[in-house]
Amino acid sequence: MNINRQTAFITGANQGIGKAIAKKLIKKGIQVIGTSTTEDGVKRINDYLEGNGFGFVLNLKNIDSITEKIQEIYKKKHSIDILINNAGIKEDNLLVNMKSTEWDDVIKTNLSSVFHLVKSVIRSMIKKRQGRIITIGSVIAYTGNKGQVNYSASKSGLIGFHKSLALEVASKGITVNIVSPGLIKTNFTEKLNSIQYQKYLSNIPMKRFGQKEEVADAVIFLASKKASYITGHTLHVNGGMYMI
């Protein structure tokens, strides 16, 4: 890796939206450090990065692991100019049936990990007086959804976190924003039967699912110099499914 090039750190870069973001960043000349929860995922990251960065295994529920991995990156003289919190999980269940572990796992992965990752990189960004912090949220944070009180709480928590953080670091040249996708075409949507497909589609004014590349484009914009005066904002990418 070239220490003179900008570097983006992306969680969950082995597939889906994370991979789409990483590939677009590479085209912009930005190096990528990507994470996955498995060695197989890391191999996939390294294959598509083609030398424009590297991947490594990271368990977002392990606080010590997050801190250690970030410190290792800095010790190797790599910078983290752009932090993209993309990884997230769902463990859906109605509240009356939800186990404590289902609540804890989702909150730790989707919300607490963002706190620990930001805390690990923020001092370096402040010292350089520049940085981008971008997190993938969800339309569910605004609309709610049956069976997802844990997921909704985790994504809603990110909104308040990012607004408060944006106020704390705005004078330091650091922007803090969220990209909030609606229904995006994934392996999940491809498994829907025609009735389920039409039910989901009926909630989207644009009458189609979003593409992961469209979410990635929003992230690329917020990471660019063109978005240098935007902070504490949530950029919705949902085809009109939710409007402020």
From Swiss-Prot:
Q: Subunit info?
A: Homotetramer.
| The organism's place on the tree of life at top rank | Bacteria
What is the species of this protein?
Buchnera aphidicola subsp. Acyrthosiphon pisum (strain APS)
What Gene3D superfamilies would the database entry show? NAD(P)-binding Rossmann-like Domain (3.40.50.720)
Which reaction(s) does its UniProt entry say it catalyses? a (3R)-hydroxyacyl-[ACP] + NADP(+) = a 3-oxoacyl-[ACP] + NADPH + H(+)
Q: Which family, according to the similarity comment? A: Belongs to the short-chain dehydrogenases/reductases (SDR) family.
Among PROSITE patterns, the record links this protein to: ADH_SHORT
Q: Name one Pfam family in it.
A: adh_short_C2
Which amino acid positions bind Ca(2+) 2, per UniProt? 145
Assigned EC number:
1.1.1.100
Q: Which UniProt keywords apply?
A: Calcium, Fatty acid biosynthesis, Fatty acid metabolism, Lipid biosynthesis, Lipid metabolism, Metal-binding, NADP, Oxidoreductase
GO: which molecular function terms? Answer: 3-oxoacyl-[acyl-carrier-protein] reductase (NADPH) activity; metal ion binding; NAD binding
Any idea which positions bind Ca(2+) 3? 234
Query: Anything else the record notes?
Result: Calcium ions stabilize the structure, and may inhibit FabG activity by obstructing access to the active site.
GO BP terms in the entry: fatty acid biosynthetic process
- The protein here is known as 3-oxoacyl-[acyl-carrier-protein] reductase FabG
Quote the record's binding site residues for substrate. 138
Pathway recorded for this protein: Lipid metabolism; fatty acid biosynthesis
Query: Which residues act catalytically here?
Result: 151
Instruction: Tell me, in a sentence or two, what this protein's role is.
Output: Catalyzes the NADPH-dependent reduction of beta-ketoacyl-ACP substrates to beta-hydroxyacyl-ACP products, the first reductive step in the elongation cycle of fatty acid biosynthesis.
Residues bound to Ca(2+) 1: 50, 53
Listed binding positions for NADP(+) are 12-15, 37, 59-60, 86, 151-155, 184
For this chain, the annotated S-S bridges are: none
Identify the gene encoding this protein. fabG
